[in-house]
Amino acid sequence: MFEKYLKSAIFLALYPLAMLASNLHEFIALSQNNESYLIKQMQSEQANLDKEQAFRNYLPSLSLSSAYVANNKDRFIIDPQESLFAKVSLNFLLFDGGAREANLRALESREKLSFLDKEQNKNYLALNAITLYFNTLSLEKILLANQQKVSFLKSTFERLQKFYDAGLSSKDELESIKAKYHLSLLELSQNELKLANIQKEIKILSDTDFKVQGNAFLENPQQEKSQNYEVMIAKEQINLAKESVNLAKAEYFPKFYIQDNFNFYKNNYNPKVSAPFANLADQFLEKYSQGNQFILGMEWKIFDFNARAKEVEKERLNVQIANANARFSERKNKEELNYLDKSLKVLQEQILALNLSLNAANLAFESVDKKYQAGLVSYVEYLQALEAKFKAQSDLELAKNEFEITKANYYFNAGIDLNSKVKE
């Protein structure tokens, strides 16, 4: 029975911790469920609906119109006192100079642009999540080092205070250690504020109080083929600009259409004539009528003072602008990836060097600390060794953090799904 209660107690104690257990994959998923991505999804759906709506607008359409008309006071004998009519119209566009096809292709291009924008936003949110994740891990380790530094200085300050009270330590040594101790407290508070700011950004991004845990990392990039979204968007803008030229050219051609109208009338004339003429009026004035009208029509703008030519010229310039923008985006992306690749190599060398520096700083501090406790070195050397030790720790954590975030930026600029490159 005791073992049963013990297991229950352990489960209840560990359950909250299990609920807090998180990883980077989960954080990315949470970040991609926020409002900005949902908006992009809805905008992509809107683009698809625009395309489908335009296609259906070009299909034959059937419309019905109906009305009741009453004429009072003075009216002609041929005007009915009351009239009820209905009209059914069938309309179909046969040819519009290619505008229909160009418009549908343009809407397909807009749909693709909306999709690319959505996917870019999804990867950008993953980049934000990764940046916040590694910034948190790095800052937590730096805070731990800050706390150790505060603890070292506090114990040293308290020991020196006793020596000073006993007349065994100088005033300047005590004040120097005291100042360093309070500066370390300030540094700790500043880093805690930075962590609070990161937690605020996490809340904004994911709408949760996500607790960063684990030691995730990203795969080291190889020579990845770039599928940068900005470049793909710029290239698709060229296709959209070309369709705008086709739409402008279509205005030079005539439009042919078919229209069929079926009309039905029911009239109550009630003519204001004397009785001898009433029967005669009834014979000539139809109370019921119906008819069908078939139209094969054409519309053609023949002259417009070269307004269409100017429109075509303007759209051709837009094609040149889109081409120039695509070339620039491609060159920019290529150079950015080259720079990030070089940065990664330098950061790897930096991490190796900082590891060696940290080992050396730890050994130096251990030696100086023992000598300082024995009174063999001055407090100046002690403070320098202490500062070097914790600076080496902070520098190493910052370099590791920058290395992971630079990898994330490399994948983002290459247009590669960041979530697929995360390793737990």
Task: Give the residues covered by each predicted segment.
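Acidic, low-complexity, intrinsically disordered peripheral segments
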Residues: 395-424
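A short glycine-centered flexible hinge/capping loop motif at secondary-structure junctions
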Residues: 164-168, 372-376, 413
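Bacterial N-terminal signal peptides that target proteins for export
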Residues: 1-13
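Bacterial Sec-pathway N-terminal export signals of envelope proteins
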Residues: 20-63, 94, 168-170, 206-253, ...
